[in-house]
UniProtKB/Swiss-Prot annotation:
Residues 695-717 are annotated as: Disordered. Its main location: mitochondrion. It comes from the Eukaryota. This is Mitochondrial potassium channel ATP-binding subunit. Residues 132-419 form the ABC transmembrane type-1 domain.
Length: 717
C-alpha cells in the first residue's frame, strides 16, 4: 500500500522529480512506541507527507472526475494512520524529503554593542581634566550665543544713525565694539584651553586602550589566534583605536559646543521673537527624527567597512610578513590581486557609507537654508508691521545662522560618531574576552620535587577550529624521567599536537596530561612554560633585536655570563663571536640576517638558558643541511643529557639513540620500542625506514648523462 502511494500521483502518474531512492525510512524502536507519543508523531508525519507531496505536484485545473489512483490516495491518507497506530512495532514510517532542500542560512554574527562599562574604566582617571574641558567648551559656546545679540544692537545703532542723521556713530558704537572684541578674545582663549585638554585626554585614553587591548590579546588562548588573522588584530590596535579617539575628541570639541550653541541660541531666539522661534521648534524635531532613522543604516555600513579594512590589512600583513616565500614562488602578482580585491570591496563599502553621509548632510543643508528663507520672509513681515525691530531681526538671523552651523557640524559629526562607536565596540570586544586557559594561577611544584615524568592518559583532542575531527583518539603515552622519547610517523598523525598539549596550549577534551602525577590543568601555566619546559621548533622565530636579547628572552633576569654559557652549550658562541658586534648584533626581523643553522642554535640557547627539566624538540633539524644538522644535533645531544626529552622527528636517523620510539598513525600509538626492536617487528617503522633509505639513495645517485643529439651539435656549429 505504501509503495503504491509513493509510486503513483493523484492524477494517475508518477510525481515529477520524485523517486523511491529519494525516500528515507526510519524504524521506531520499542522504547518510543507508547500510544500517545507515537500516535501524535505519526499524525504529524502523515500531515507533513501530504503537504510536501501537494507542493511537488504540478498545478492544474480541478479534474471533472478522479482517477482510480486518486481514491488510493484518499484511502491511504485515511487508512495509513490507523494501520500505523495499531501496529507501531511492525510498520515502517516513510519520511519524504525533497532532493534539493534549500541550503541552511548562515548564522549572522551578533551585532557588536558598545561597552559603556569599559569606556567608563578608561575615562574615569581623566574626569577632572574632562570636566575642565567641558566647562571651557560650554563657556566658548555661551560666548558664541552672546555675539549675535551684540551684533544686533550694533546694527540697530547703524540703522538709527542712518535714519535720524544725528549723534556720533563712533561714540555710540565704541562700547559695543569693545565688548565684541573682548568676547572674541575670550572665545579664542576658551577654545585653546579645551582643545589642549581634550588632546591630552584623548591621547592618554588611546594609549591606555592600546595597552589594555594588547595585554588582552597576548593572554588569549592559542585557539583564538588559530581563528583570527594577525592583520585584523593589528588593525584593531591601530586603526580602530585611532578612529575611536578622534570621535571622542570631536564629540566634546564640536558636539558639546554645537549642542550648547543650539540650546543657547534657541533661548535667545525665543526672547527675540516667539513666533519665529515656534517655526524653528516645529521643524527641528522633524529633522532630528529623520537623522535618527538614517543613523541605524549608516552604523551598519560603518561596521562592515571597518571589518573589510581589517581583512585588507590582514592580506597585506600576511604577504609582507612572508615576502621571501612570495618572492620565491614569483607570486607578487597574485598577492597584488588579492590585496586589490579586498581594497575594491573596502572602497565599495566606504563609498556606500560616504553616499549615505553625503545624503544626510545634503538634506540637512537644504532644510536649514529653507529655514533661513522662511525666517527672512516672516521676519520681514513682522518688521514691516512694526512688530519687530530691524536690529532684532538681524540678531535673529545671526543666531539662526549659529543654529544652522551648529546643526551642520552635528550632521558632519554624526558620521564620525557612528564610526567611532563601531570602532570602540570592536576594540572593547576583545578586551572583554577571557581566555579558557589562564596565564597564571595554579600549583607550582617545588624545584626539589620536579622529576620530569610525563603521562598522557586516554587523551582525546580536536582543535577548536575543527571541532568533531579528533586529532588524538584515546592516546596514551608515558615519558619517563630523564629519558628520550621520540614520536615518528606520517604527517597528520598528531605528533605536534602532543607537544602542544604538553605545553598546555590547549586542554584535552577527554583524558589527562600529568607532570609528576599532577594534572597540567592544576599547575601554573606561566611557571610550567617559563621554568619547566623548553621548546625548540622547526622554524625558530627570532625578534628584531640583538643576539643577547634574543637569548635572554628565555630568562629575562639572566646575567651576561649565563647567556654566554647557554650559547656555548648550543654551539653558538663561536659564530656569534665572529660577528663584528658579537652579541650586540641585530638579527633583523625574524632573524633574516642569519642562516637556518645559526637561528636554530640561538633558539637552542634561548631554551637552555632557563635550565628546563623537560625539553621538546619539534623537528629541530629537519630544515637544515647536512653540516648544519651535524652541529645542531651535537648541541641537542648535549642539551638532552639528564632531561626528559620529547623528540618529534621526520628524519628517522636522528632518533635511533632514543630510549623509546613511538610510531603514531591517525592519532593513536601503533608501535612502540627501540630502534632495533621496531626493525625486527617489520611494521610501519620498518616501512618508513625503508622509504627514507630508498629516497636517500635515489637522491644521492647522479642521473646518467644523456648523449647529445648530433643534430643539435650541428646546429651549434
Amino acid at each position: 500500500m505504501l509503495v503504491h502511494l509513493f509510486r503513483f500521483g493523484i492524477r494517475g502518474g508518477p510525481v515529477p522529480g520524485w523517486s523511491l531512492q529519494s525516500l528515507r525510512f526510519q524504524t521506531f524502536s520499542a522504547a518510543r512506541s507508547s500510544d500517545d507519543r507515537l500516535s501524535s508523531h505519526l499524525l504529524r508525519t502523515v500531515a507533513q507527507l501530504r503537504v510536501q507531496l501537494r507542493a511537488h505536484l504540478p498545478r492544474a485545473p480541478p479534474a471533472s472526475h478522479w482517477s482510480p489512483s486518486a481514491w488510493c490516495w484518499v484511502g491511504g491518507t485515511l487508512v495509513v494512520p490507523a494501520v500505523l497506530w495499531q501496529h507501531p512495532r511492525l510498520c515502517l514510517i516513510a519520511l519524504c524529503e525533497a532532493k534539493e532542500s534549500p541550503p541552511a542560512q548562515p548564522t549572522r554574527a551578533p551585532e557588536l554593542r558598545f561597552n559603556w562599562k569599559l569606556f567608563w574604566h578608561f575615562l574615569h582617571p581623566h574626569l577632572l581634566a574632562l570636566g575642565a574641558a567641558i566647562v571651557l567648551a560650554l563657556g566658548a559656546a555661551l560666548v558664541n550665543v552672546q555675539i549675535p545679540l551684540l551684533l544686533g544692537q550694533l546694527v540697530e545703532i547703524v540703522a538709527k544713525y542712518t535714519r535720524d542723521h544725528m549723534g556720533s556713530f563712533v561714540s555710540e558704537s565704541r562700547k559695543l565694539s569693545v565688548q565684541l572684541l573682548l568676547l572674541y578674545g575670550v572665545q579664542g582663549l576658551l577654545t585653546f584651553g579645551y582643545l589642549v585638554l581634550l588632546s591630552h585626554i584623548g591621547e592618554r585614553m588611546a594609549m591606555d586602550m592600546r595597552k589594555a587591548l594588547f595585554s588582552s590579546l597576548l593572554r588569549q588562548d592559542i585557539a583564538f589566534f588559530d581563528a583570527k588573522k594577525t592583520g585584523q588584530l593589528v588593525s584593531r590596535l591601530t586603526t580602530d583605536v585611532q578612529e575611536f579617539k578622534s570621535s571622542f575628541k570631536l564629540v566634546i570639541s564640536q558636539g558639546l559646543r554645537s549642542c550648547t550653541q543650539v540650546i543657547g541660541s534657541l533661548v535667545s531666539l525665543s526672547m527675540l521673537s516667539p513666533r519665529l522661534t515656534l517655526m524653528l521648534a516645529v521643524v527641528t524635531p522633524a529633522l532630528m527624527g529623520v537623522g535618527t532613522l538614517m543613523g541605524s543604516g549608516l552604523r551598519k555600513l560603518s561596521r562592515q567597512c571597518q571589518e573589510q579594512i581589517a581583512r585588507a590589512t590582514g592580506v597585506a600583513d600576511e604577504a609582507l610578513g612572508n615576502v621571501r616565500t612570495v618572492r620565491a614562488f614569483a607570486m607578487e602578482k597574485r598577492e597584488e590581486e588579492r590585496y586589490q580585491a579586498e581594497l575594491e570591496s573596502c572602497c565599495c563599502k566606504a563609498e556606500e557609507l560616504g553616499r549615505g553621509i553625503a545624503l544626510f548632510q545634503g538634506l540637512s543643508n537644504i532644510a536649514f537654508n529653507c529655514m533661513v528663507l522662511g525666517t527672512l520672509f516672516i521676519g520681514g513681515s513682522l518688521v514691516a508691521g512694526q512688530q519687530l525691530k530691524g536690529g532684532d531681526l538681524m540678531s535673529f538671523l545671526v543666531a539662526s545662522q549659529t543654529v544652522q552651523r551648529s546643526m551642520a557640524s552635528l550632521s558632519v559629526l554624526f558620521g564620525q560618531v557612528v564610526r567611532g562607536l563601531s570602532a570602540g565596540a570592536r576594540v572593547f570586544e576583545y578586551m572583554a574576552l577571557s581566555p579558557v586557559i589562564p596565564l597564571t594561577g595554579g600549583y607550582c611544584i617545588p624545584n626539589k620535587d620536579i622529576r620530569g615524568s610525563i603521562t598522557f592518559q586516554n587523551v582525546t583532542f580536536s582543535y577548536p577550529c575543527r571541532p568533531g575531527f579528533n586529532v588524538l583518539k584515546d592516546f596514551t603515552l608515558k615519558l619517563p624521567s630523564g629519558k628520550i622519547v621520540a614520536l615518528v610517523g606520517q604527517s597528520g598523525g598528531g605528533k605536534t599536537t602532543v607537544a602542544s598539549l604538553l605545553e598546555r596550549f590547549y586542554d584535552p577534551e577527554a583524558g589527562s596530561v600529568t607532570l609528576d602525577g599532577h594534572d597540567l590543568r592544576t599547575l601554573n601555566p606561566s611557571w610550567l612554560r617559563g621554568q619547566v619546559i623548553g621548546f625548540i621548533s622547526q622554524e625558530p622565530v627570532l625578534f628584531a633585536t640583538t643576539i643577547m636579547e634574543n637569548i635572554r628572552f628565555g630568562k629575562l633576569d639572566a646575567s651576561d655570563e649565563e647567556v654566554y654559557t647557554a650559547a656555548r652549550e648550543a654551539n653558538a658562541h663561536e659564530f656569534i663571536s665572529s660577528f663584528p658586534d658579537g652579541y650586540s648584533t641585530v638579527v633583523g626581523e625574524r632573524g633574516t640576517t642569519l642562516s637556518g643553522g645559526q637561528k636554530q642554535r640561538l633558539a637552542i640557547a634561548r631554551a637552555l638558558i632557563k635550565q628546563p627539566t623537560v625539553l621538546i624538540l619539534d623537528e629541530a633539524t629537519s630544515a637544515l643541511d647536512a653540516e648544519s644538522e651535524r652541529v645542531v644535533q651535537e648541541a641537542l645531544d648535549r642539551a638532552s643529557a639528564g632531561r626528559t626529552v620529547l623528540v618529534i622527528a621526520h628524519r628517522l636517523s636522528t632518533v635511533r639513540a632514543a630510549h623509546s620510539i613511538i610510531v603514531m598513525a591517525n592519532g593513536q600509538v601503533c608501535e612502540a620500542g627501540t630502534h632495533e626492536e621496531l626493525l625486527k617487528k617489520g611494521g610501519l617503522y620498518s616501512e618508513l625506514i625503508r622509504r627514507q633509505t630508498l629516497d636517500a639513495s635515489l637522491t644521492s645517485t647522479p642521473p646518467a648523462e644523456k648523449p647529445e643529439d648530433p643534430k643539435s651539435c650541428q646546429s651549434k656549429a
